[in-house]
């Protein structure tokens, strides 16, 4: 079994001009979260062809997602090509998503990495970096993510200093941060990353704002002392990129803020958009003032009562 937490990007640049997919990606800052993707892998037939593996995917509401396996079959083909898997046996692979797709929680990257590392547990071949590089390339090939694989590789609260795949041109750092947080999203909404990163106007706005934000935080140690800078720059990024001005996001953020005010927690939390969904994360304003279990439960129940979806999770650091 393999479990990989999701990832939230708080601000970023779009850097996909490189000829090689392994050098494309993004720079920026993000947070790894505990909820993500769980994978169970077992042998189906010891003499069977790996291409005949059974792959079942379940969404966060435990409903089977049909016709969603091509992504993972591409991964298995690439692992065989790289000699990290043999052409037999065939497998039974069950993939369970713990959060919705297309809401900025990196379910595609987490799913790929979870399946890749489950295959590595079985084959006991290659380095972790090799598997992450393959996952990054598939993400770029499908336009489903820029820096999620590199962010997950770093763990915790991460900064991506150079775009690309881990172990190729990509460079990222992460620090541990034991904090409960709350994810909130608009249930009917979903947005594919490519809508923004393939649009020249959005790409320019996002990258300009992302460069400004990153330049303000990249110098100096990467640790808890940067928390205020991260909160400040993620707020500025949302305004400068104009992502927070889109009507759906603007209305969504207003609704979230009014609920936070109604339970009188506005002085203890900061609301930040998750790139690029109609979703946000509630982060502690100060790391020495952790939200209590009661406060977390109150927030979650109020969001759900008001027609939003919410999940209590935590910042995650995987060694």
Predicted regions and their residues:
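Short beta-strand-to-loop capping motifs
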Residues: 43, 186, 282-286
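Acyltransferase
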Residues: 174-241, 245
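DPxDG-like acidic metal-binding loop motif
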Residues: 105-128
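Glycine-rich, charge-dense phosphate/pyrophosphate-binding loop(s)
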Residues: 223-319
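Alpha/beta catalytic cores of group-transfer enzymes, especially the acyltransferase/condensing modules
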Residues: 129-173
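ATP-binding N-lobe of GHMP and related small-molecule kinases
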Residues: 1-101, 124, 313-319
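Solvent-exposed alpha-helices and their adjacent loops that cap or buttress functional pockets
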Residues: 2-3, 21-22, 30-33, 142-144, ...
